[in-house]
């Protein structure tokens, strides 16, 4: 099996129905409000630094809470779910819809039959690293010609 670092430098292509590495991913029993939802997950990729990853996730009928300890953008691939957000708003999302959950958010999920999503998960950098990254970017821009100039600076990438 390839390591995360190997995967980061080797492109990967998956067909919609090429899912063979599903593992059980039970909804925390304390979060289940109704029914007996059965969830599975399949890891697809991770960034070299481990801060970002993608997964297929699916779940059968049930109602449960979900708490996000990282940023997650999800794309509904199949089925539908009604999401009730902590501010009281509700939204029914279906295949093709995209939802973003920032770290620290939560939602009540009501899955009528089945849901399958593609999840893009990202762990935010600590504040001091964001500041350092931004400083490096500013330094790199110092040597660049303005975009309209077309000449490119000595630090252009």
Locations of regions flagged by a protein language model:
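A short, N-terminal "cap"/entry segment at the start of jelly-roll beta-barrel domains
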Residues: 1-50, 152-157
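Conserved short histidine dyad/triad with adjacent acidic residue
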Residues: 43, 50-68
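Short, conserved beta-strand element in jelly-roll/cupin
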Residues: 59, 68-83
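Short hydrophobic/aromatic-rich beta-strand segments that constitute the beta-sheet cores
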Residues: 66, 83, 117-120
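Short acidic-glycine-tyrosine-enriched beta hairpin
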Residues: 87-103
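Ligand-binding loop in jelly-roll beta-barrel domains
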Residues: 95, 103-128
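Acidic/histidine-enriched, glycine/proline-rich intrinsically disordered or flexible terminal extensions
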Residues: 127-157
